[in-house]
């Protein structure tokens, strides 16, 4: 596969990694291909624009090894997209595993209570996605779940709206301020 892509795009002005991020064929394992290229490459740093695209693909693929490889090559894990969302937002939305989310929390330098452009915090995203491991991790990092988004919805109100009784119970039992909706 790598030989095919290398030969196909050899005369292109784009790098092979730039071409890889443009592939949307589900039959091709993009993250495995990118990891192989990064490991075999002699480059010490990856362009952040390309790195961000690969990082988002890696979070949706729940590929902690690729996220770590990109981080080692200088890709900034806390970079925000046009909507103010980071790789951590995308990992939570994608239902990524606890280890990947924990790695991003510990290494991305992201304010755990920062809002995206809709006013949603990471806790809003975790509750909205019904991502219990992410909610628990965010709680250990003292994430706020009483802050409303721009529509006035707190994570607790979202849990109630979606009927996530287990989330309501989890947030209420771990709340030092009590349960206010």
UniProtKB/Swiss-Prot annotation:
The keyword Repeat applies. InterPro entries: Ankyrin_rpt (IPR002110), Ankyrin_rpt-contain_sf (IPR036770). SMART domains: ANK. Pfam families: Ank_2. ANK repeats lie at residues 50-79, 83-114, 118-147, 151-180. Keywords: ANK repeat, Repeat. This is Putative ankyrin repeat protein RBE_0150. It comes from Rickettsia bellii (strain RML369-C). The lineage of its organism: Bacteria, Pseudomonadati, Pseudomonadota, Alphaproteobacteria, Rickettsiales.
